[in-house]
Each structure stands twice: as C-alpha cells, then as structure tokens.
C-alpha cells in the first residue's frame, strides 16, 4: 500500500501546469474520495465476545469512501467538514463469525504549502465523531450478539493536491483515526487508516473581469459671445481705447483667463452704426476690433489664438427704429444708434458659462 501511495504521488507531480493548486482566498469547495480503508489492532474481546470468535481470517482491508465540504481562508489555511465510510470488516471462523463497521463525520483544519504553482502538500488535523457497529454469530450455541457505540477520536492526515484547472483539483490523501469503538460494547477498539484518491470542485475561481472604463465624453465645443459697447471703449468716431474701455477689457480678460482660452479661439468683431460711408465704417470697425485684440494680447492672450474682424454696418441691432436713413444724424439719432456701435468677442471651445462684464 505504501508503494502505491508513492507511485500515485509521483504521477500527480508529473502533470504540473500553470494552474494554482490552492483555491482563491475566501472561497468554498466540495469533493468526494474513494480508497482503501484498513483496520489495525482488531483483537475482539469482552462483553460476550468470547476468545473463540474470529478464529478464522479477519478482512482488515476494505473499500472506504467519503465526501467533504471545505472553506479556503487563504493560500495556507482551510477548513473541511466531511463524512467518511471506513468500511465493513468481516471476521470469519470455522464456527463463529461476525462483522465490524464504522463511519463518521470529521472536522479538520487543512494546512497547505505550495511546492509548485499547481501542486501543494498538506496536512489535516482535527477530530472525527464516529459510530461503530458490530455483530457476532456463534454457530455452536446459535447465539447472536450485536451492538453499536459512538465517540470522538483524533484525526490526522497528510497528502498532496494537484490543480487540474482553476475549478477542478485532485488529491492523494492518507488519513489516520485512532481508537474507534469501545471494546466493552462492540468487542473491538481498532485504529483506522485510509488511503484515498479524491476530486474537488472549487467555487468562485474565475477571474473577475473589471468593466471597461466608459469612454471619455467627446469635448463639447461651444461658442460664447460677449458684447461691449463702443461708447464705453472708444470716443465717438475714434478707435483708440479710453481708460474706461481698458477697465472693461481688464474685467473681460480676467474671465477669459479663468476659461483658459488656450484651448479655444477668440474672434473680436467690430461694428459701427450706419452714419457715414460704408467704406469709412468698415475701416473704423476693423481698427476698433484690432485695438481690442492688441490690448488683450498685451494682457497675455496668445496672439495665435485671437483675431480681429471688421463688420462695418452689418447686423444692426436697432434696425429702422431710430429713423436714420442717410446724411447727417441728429444727436437723438446718434444716441438711438448707440447699440449698433459695439464690439463683440466670440470665444469658441469653452464650455463654462460666464457672466459678461458690464460696460
């Protein structure tokens, strides 16, 4: 039996792959095993079990089996709860015969140590709550005896475990349980060893795939427009900035800086009213727009991000409400046409909404 155990252990070690032998931390597994169960110290005596019983061969080697449920706390420590059928051992004599059988529920700590990426050695230490049953038949007298006993015995095991895949593993296990049964009740108090080959399925071993990060939203290009009155920026019919106009542009520059205009573009649009020739008004609107650009560049706006454009008399705000058609305008008409004399600053690529300065 020892040669068989060594051969199986070597065979398992030869199947090394990259799978992990130990389950992931804080996961559960379940399995079953089948193997050879052997009883030791099987002398029968006491409480009606006379010396003549079992005067023939005692079949100490029997088929054993079991099932288990385990919890893997970490790579090195797990806990197992299992059921073992230790086998039915008949003892046969020429006249007297009988049988002894045992089964139990075990609870043990499993201590593992990896010797390869896919192979662990381990020991299990714990106890077994067992039930032992026996019966005897006396051919000469026709007497039949049967009884059972229960108790707790220490349990120890050693083994190797090999990971077939992430979820499946197999193990070779050699287990020892001492003093099963009370001799005064069931006529024997044997020890038991079981060499078994088991297979287990481990839950929760698949790698958790993190969801793909949501794509960054596409930048929203927006256009913000600021309108400054030309009468605040310039004297009538002039393109040189007044002190009051510079103060208004200082306020505007503060807001443009907070908006980070490097990420966008700035267009300064100059407008005039309809008083005067088209050619003159076009030139005046260009000069006024350029004056604003030059001042903002001097404050720190990159020159390649800002441009000037003269719009002349285009896009009049007042329309026909002021009654001016051509020629010399009255003072009242000049005052009425003031909204047409303006500078508009168009900022593209800036999403934040800001409040335009008051002129």
From Swiss-Prot:
A GO molecular-function annotation: porin activity
Pfam family, one: OmpA
Signal peptide (from-to): 1-21
InterPro entries assigned: Bact_OuterMem_StrucFunc, OMP/PagP_b-brl, OMP_bac, OmpA, OmpA-like, OMPA-like_CS, OmpA-like_sf, OmpA-like_TM_dom
Protein location: Cell outer membrane
Residues in Sequence repeats: 210-211, 212-213, 214-215, 216-217, 218-219
A biological process from GO: monoatomic ion transmembrane transport
Annotated site (Part of salt bridge gating mechanism): 80, 171
Gene3D superfamilies referenced in this protein's UniProt entry, alphabetically: 2.40.160.20, OmpA-like domain
Family annotation (PROSITE patterns): OMPA_1 (PS01068), OMPA_2 (PS51123)
Keyword list, A-Z: Cell outer membrane, Disulfide bond, Ion transport, Membrane, Porin, Repeat, Signal, Transmembrane, Transmembrane beta strand, Transport
Main localisation: membrane
Region (5 X 2 AA tandem repeats of A-P): 210-219
CDD domains in the record: OmpA_C-like
The UniProt record lists the keyword Transferase: no
Membrane topology classification: Multi-pass membrane protein
Disulphide bond pairs: 322-336
Residue intervals passing through the bilayer: 27-37, 62-73, 77-85, 103-114, 119-127, 154-163, 168-175, 194-202
Gene Ontology annotations for the cellular component aspect, listed alphabetically: cell outer membrane; pore complex
Entry similarity comment: Belongs to the outer membrane OOP (TC 1.B.6) superfamily. OmpA family.
UniProt function note: With TolR probably plays a role in maintaining the position of the peptidoglycan cell wall in the periplasm. Acts as a porin with low permeability that allows slow penetration of small solutes; an internal gate slows down solute passage.
Domain notes: The extracellular loops are most variable in sequence, and in some bacteria confer sensitivity to phage and/or colicins.
Listed HAMAP family: OmpA
Quaternary structure note: Monomer and homodimer.
Record's protein name: Outer membrane protein A
Organism (species): Serratia marcescens
Gene this protein is translated from: ompA
């Amino acid at each position: 039996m020892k040669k068989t155990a060594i051969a199986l252990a070597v065979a398992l070690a030869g199947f090394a792959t990259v799978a992990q032998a130990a389950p992931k931390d804080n996961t559960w597994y379940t399995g079953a095993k089948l193997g050879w169960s052997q009883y030791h110290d099987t002398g029968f005596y006491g409480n009606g079990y006379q010396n003549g019983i079992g005067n023939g061969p005692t079949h100490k080697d029997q088929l054993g089996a079991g099932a288990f449920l385990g919890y893997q706390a970490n790579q090195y420590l797990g806990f197992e709860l299992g059921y073992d059928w230790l086998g039915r051992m008949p003892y046969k004599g020429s006249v007297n015969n009988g049988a002894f059988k045992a089964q139990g529920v075990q609870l043990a700590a499993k201590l593992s140590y990896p010797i390869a990426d896919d192979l662990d050695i381990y020991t299990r230490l714990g106890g077994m709550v067992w039930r032992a049953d026996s019966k005897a038949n006396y051919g000469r007298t026709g007497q039949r005896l049967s009884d059972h006993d229960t108790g707790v015995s220490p349990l120890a095991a050693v083994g190797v475990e090999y990971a077939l895949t992430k979820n499946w593993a197999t193990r070779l296990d050699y287990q020892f349980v001492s003093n099963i049964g009370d001799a005064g009740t069931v006529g024997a108090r044997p020890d038991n060893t079981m060499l078994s080959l088991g297979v287990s399925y481990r839950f929760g071993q698949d790698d958790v795939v993190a969801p793909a990060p949501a794509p960054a939203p596409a930048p929203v290009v927006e256009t913000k427009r600021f309108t400054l009155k030309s009468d605040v920026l310039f004297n009538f019919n002039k393109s040189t900035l007044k002190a009051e106009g510079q103060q208004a542009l200082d306020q505007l520059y503060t807001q443009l800086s907070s908006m980070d205009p490097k990420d966008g573009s700035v267009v300064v649009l100059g407008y005039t009213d309809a008083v005067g020739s088209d050619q003159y008004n076009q030139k005046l609107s260009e000069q006024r727009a350029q004056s604003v650009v030059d001042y903002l560049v001097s404050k720190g706006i990159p020159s390649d991000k800002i441009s000037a454009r003269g719009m002349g008399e285009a896009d009049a705000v007042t329309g026909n409400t002021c009654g001016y058609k051509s020629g010399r305008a009255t003072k009242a008409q000049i005052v009425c046409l003031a909204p047409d004399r303006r500078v508009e600053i168009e900022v593209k690529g800036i999403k934040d909404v800001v409040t335009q300065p008051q002129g």
